[in-house]
């Protein structure tokens, strides 16, 4: 049965406190938030994000360019673009015409210059997905 779409597509982009992709599965702790509490904007803060990509049958075994950016509300990037390629093969037991999902997890520490709105954006060929989050100051825990 055909997958119903012809182009690779970003299925999801999700933020998390801790993300990891192992053997095609996503492991996440503290996921799907849109508010990040920051004690000190002079220090980098840890968080990650996961990208799920649906790849149609005809694009299996192709290297697809993926670019991820993190920017502030003014559009200024807080880190250089993260660039990679995504490729999935067809396993021997694949159903002809099926789509395949690739999962990418990026964990890091990021320097957010000030309180405000930030955008994580993933771009793949013609598709794009973005998620906004709000960095807010909090008092240092006692």
Cite the ranges covered by each PLM segment.
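Contiguous segments within soluble domain cores/interaction surfaces
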Residues: 2-124, 128-142
């Amino acid at each position: 049965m055909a997958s119903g779409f012809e182009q690779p597509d970003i299925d999801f982009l999700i933020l998390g406190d801790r993300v990891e992709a192992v053997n095609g599965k996503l492991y996440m702790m503290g996921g799907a938030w849109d508010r990040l509490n920051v004690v000190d904007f002079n220090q980098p803060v840890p968080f990650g994000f996961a990208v799920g990509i649906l790849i149609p049958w005809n694009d299996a075994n192709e290297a697809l360019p993926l670019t991820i950016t993190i920017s502030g509300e003014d559009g200024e990037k807080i880190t250089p673009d993260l660039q990679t390629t995504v490729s999935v093969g067809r396993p021997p037991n694949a159903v002809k015409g099926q789509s395949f999902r690739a999962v990418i997890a990026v964990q890091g520490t990021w320097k957010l210059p000030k309180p405000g709105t930030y955008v994580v954006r993933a771009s793949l060929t013609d598709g794009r997905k973005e998620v906004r989050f709000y960095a807010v100051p909090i008092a240092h825990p006692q």
